[in-house]
Each structure stands twice: as structure tokens, then as C-alpha cells.
Amino acid sequence: NHYKKDIAFRSGLAITRQINTSFNFARNKVWGLDGNQVRTETQTRDFFPKGIMGNKGLPMAGWSIRFTGVEKWPLVKKIARSASIEHGFNGKETRAWQNRSLQTSKYTSSFSPLLGISMSSKKGTTISSRYALVTTVDNRFGGINSTRVRTDNTWTASTNYSHRGGFNI
């Protein structure tokens, strides 16, 4: 027999007409007995990891924030018809037990994007750039304990141009 319990909360808030936020928190628990009568349990929840092993953090909702109206800023208004800045965070903690003994724990911290910019120029060009930072801490227990940390830095950029109208031959 296996059992599952899920809970999730989502919300958003328009702080001003130009600043919009969203928040989400989820928790999942699965437990039961396998064919050999070994009790297994896995828990996953939104989490802000801290410390070398990630476990010094605290449960925390993920968030996103978007600033629109950036095209009105002095340096930007000369070139942009519209512009926005965005930022987001999502963190996870996943822990697994066997017969009530912790076997693994994994912590992920994802700033995606840490900073993102989107802009449409007055000449028909759209530009988008995003920088993301993702750190994963993977802990193994029982026998030989180990901790593996991986950090990925990603920068993406794209541009598009469109022209409307006809042409003469």
C-alpha cells in the first residue's frame, strides 16, 4: 500500500500597475510498504536551501516579480517602445527514507531568471536576455556519506526583427 498527501498554495499581488508578483508553495508526501515490507517515504516541498548540505534553509514559497513600464526610464525611453524586467526563484527540498532512516536529500535553488530583460524597440526589433543561476546539492547517507554540489550559470539572449508593410518592384 502507498499513500500520498499533496498541498499547494498559489497567489499573486499587483503591488502597483507596473509591479506584479506571484507566489506558490507546494508540499508532497508519499509513503508505504514495498513488497519486502520495507517502509519507504519521500517528501518534497518548496524550500530556500542554505548551508553546505542545503538543509540549513527553511520552507519558503517560490516567487516571481515583473516590472513593466521600464520604457519610461530616461535611458530606455530613447530606444524602447516597451520594456520589462523580471526575476524569479524556486527552491526544492526532496528527502527519502527507508525504514525511517534518511537515505538521500536533494536541495535545488533556482533563480530563473536571476535577471531577465525584454524590450521592443521603436524600429520593430524585440530583444530578450535572461541570466539564470541553479544550484543543486545532492546528499547520500548510509554506508559512505557523500555530498555533491553542482552550479549552472546560464545566459540566454535572443533578438527578432519584423517589418510590416509592402514593397514596390
Name every feature range the model reports, one short phrase each:
Residues 1-169:
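Exposed, low-structure sequence patches enriched in small/polar residues
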